[in-house]
């Protein structure tokens, strides 16, 4: 990884926008070698609605927030390249999302999702990095988010026999050592702190086996911005003010 990117991520202060300010400290010649690129991944889309409830669909909320995050980064740092895995209501496979970020040589990947729980009382934000699922509720998140691969006609070939609904698949999953783990953890912690500053309840940073993170060759996180199963949070996420607040916390 170029020194410019390592320097930027290591000295992140309060948010991603603050992180990007660090680019100004790097010599222009070094910056020119590789443009700092942020890929923003709006979860689900098209035939994959994601979680649904309280009058909202995950795919619509994630797209709206993703666009706001990108706009805020561009406004504050026009020198940064901002790309989206999807900018409309279309279906994009999990592997295709990671492949896009890798092909674009992204410096960071931010995957935005909406949570759900059987209990309507569960609420809050949480941000995931690639790691071993230590608790049953963590594994349920991985199964839910990875299940989108089943909507792809050739998923058995694309994902090499990985079954997102099978506990055994996760047990046998070859994690290897994630070279970007520490940077991803640092970024996830910063985002959760920003959520708290915005008045949102933080459920903390968690590790899980999420396909889009496992296939991304850069620091990457998946953030769950709230529970659509909770009426109050659903109302907040569906409102323009709520989406602006959440986007500011991520950006």
Predicted regions and their residues:
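Bacterial N-terminal signal peptides
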Residues: 15-27
């Amino acid at each position: 990884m170029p020194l410019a990117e390592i320097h930027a991520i290591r000295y992140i202060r309060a948010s991603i926008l603050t992180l990007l300010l660090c680019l100004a400290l790097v010599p222009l010649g070094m910056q020119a070698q590789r443009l700092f690129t942020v890929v923003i991944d709006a979860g689900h889309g098209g035939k994959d609605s994601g979680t649904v409830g309280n009058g909202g669909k995950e795919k619509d909320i994630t797209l709206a927030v993703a666009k706001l995050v990108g706009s805020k980064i561009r406004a504050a740092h026009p020198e940064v390249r901002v790309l989206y895995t999807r900018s409309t209501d279309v279906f994009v496979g999990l592997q295709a999302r990671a492949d896009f970020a890798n092909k674009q040589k992204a410096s960071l990947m931010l995957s935005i999702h909406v949570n759900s729980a059987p209990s309507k009382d569960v609420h809050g934000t949480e941000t995931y990095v690639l790691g071993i699922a230590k608790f049953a509720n963590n594994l349920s998140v991985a199964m839910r988010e990875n299940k989108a691969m089943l909507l792809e006609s050739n998923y058995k070939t694309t994902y090499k026999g990985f079954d997102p609904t099978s506990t055994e698949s996760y047990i046998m999953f070859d994690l290897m050592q994630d070279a970007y783990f520490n940077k991803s953890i640092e970024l996830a912690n910063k985002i959760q702190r920003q959520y708290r500053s915005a008045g949102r309840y933080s459920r903390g940073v968690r590790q899980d086996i999420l396909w889009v993170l496992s296939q991304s060759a850069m620091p990457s996180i998946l953030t769950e911005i709230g529970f659509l199963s909770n009426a109050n949070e659903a109302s907040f996420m569906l409102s323009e003010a709520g989406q602006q607040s959440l986007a500011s916390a991520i950006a």
